[in-house]
């Protein structure tokens, strides 16, 4: 089991007269080597679940384990090291470094400027159709091109888990399909978790987690392996 979530609650304004539940009593188990979608209306808690799984949001109560390790038992430095080693992140905003070239931006997670690393980065940019922009700066690219560069950056360290939050929002439909096809290829060696409003990009998903008002209401199973029905709180 790659991720195990038990009795997870995430509460904002905890202790105040009015508390806001972002996540309510979430129980979930996820295996690796899959494409998992998280869907729900705005404010439903889907991004909160993604960031909690990634260790970027600490739960108000409950536990999250990754490869048998509870996040709550890790020091901040060990948590950071784990994310850097095993995780790749793709956010709705690209967060590219303005003064660096696209190629150098892609290389930042691995801090490696060797010929081999540069060739790997260029190969990723080529798969995403923007290799010709490797020497450009972020401001010279369109929004969709910058997002593709951010995707290449997330993949450069061969992560075991790829987290994506509305990653195709700035892409046209064809580009979105190309990106999801590339991410689907990574499921042979990684777990890919994608938050989206667009159900059409999840046509190849193994599971789609549906969230409403902070609770998992259902999981649509495309394929049965790796899905633990007993761990879902409905």
Predicted regions and their residues:
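ABC ATPase NBD coupling module
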Residues: 20, 71-88, 228
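Helix-to-loop junction immediately C-terminal to a conserved catalytic motif
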Residues: 54
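Conserved ABC transporter NBD signature motif
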Residues: 62-71
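Short coil-to-helix segment of the ABC ATPase nucleotide-binding domain corresponding to the Q-loop/switch region
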Residues: 100-107
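Conserved ABC ATPase signature
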Residues: 137-147
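A short, proline-enriched helix->beta-strand linker immediately N-terminal to the Walker B motif
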Residues: 156-160
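Catalytic Walker B motif of ABC-type/P-loop ATPase nucleotide-binding domains
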Residues: 162-165
